[in-house]
Regions:
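Membrane-interfacial segments
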Residues: 35, 39-43, 102, 106, ...
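Short runs within selected transmembrane alpha-helices of multi-pass transporters and secretion channels
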Residues: 25-26, 30, 49-75, 79-99, ...
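Serine/threonine-rich low-complexity intrinsically disordered regions
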Residues: 1, 45-47, 102, 125, ...
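Specific pore-lining/lateral-gate transmembrane helices of multi-pass inner-membrane transport
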Residues: 1-42, 46, 55, 63, ...
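Interhelical loop/hinge segments that connect adjacent transmembrane helices in multipass membrane
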Residues: 2-5, 128-140
Length: 140
């Protein structure tokens, strides 16, 4: 059934959970030096910028997942299939390119870029669906 009032309500609630997650990830980033010390001691030095980049990826990926869950629930997965296939083709060359110049941060940056592309398309798609303005590829 197409209960858009209920779906909008769920989307809003899930968005609040996402905001809480952003706060939790941010707190974890600031606590990371202490947590790393407890977890692995002085065996490995993890750069703070690496922690921040992983946190950024986590936040982007969680936002992306929120959109995808609802899109999958509605069954409008054609656009998702195309966008993810393009992302898969672009991810490895982009990771290799950025990894060559920036190292491990380049690979994480590549993941962030690809997931930002996903998130952009999927956020537009779910908002079109929930506002009942989706047509063409946006609703298939």
């Amino acid at each position: 059934q197409k209960d858009f009032v209920w779906m909008n309500s769920i989307y809003r609630k899930m968005t609040y959970v996402f905001y809480f997650l952003c706060i939790a990830v941010t707190c974890t980033v600031f606590a990371s030096p202490i947590l790393y010390k407890i977890w692995i001691g002085d065996k490995v030095d993890i750069p703070f910028v690496l922690t921040c980049s992983i946190a950024l990826y986590t936040i982007i990926h969680c936002w992306d997942s929120l959109q995808v869950m609802l899109i999958n629930g509605v069954g409008s997965v054609k656009l998702q299939t195309y966008v993810v296939l393009i992302g898969l083709v672009l991810h490895i060359p982009l990771s290799l390119f950025l990894g060559h110049f920036v190292g491990i941060l380049g690979v994480i940056l590549s993941m962030c870029i690809i997931n930002l592309i996903y998130s952009t398309f999927f956020t537009i798609q779910i908002r079109k669906i929930l506002s009942q303005k989706a047509t063409g590829i946006w609703i298939k």
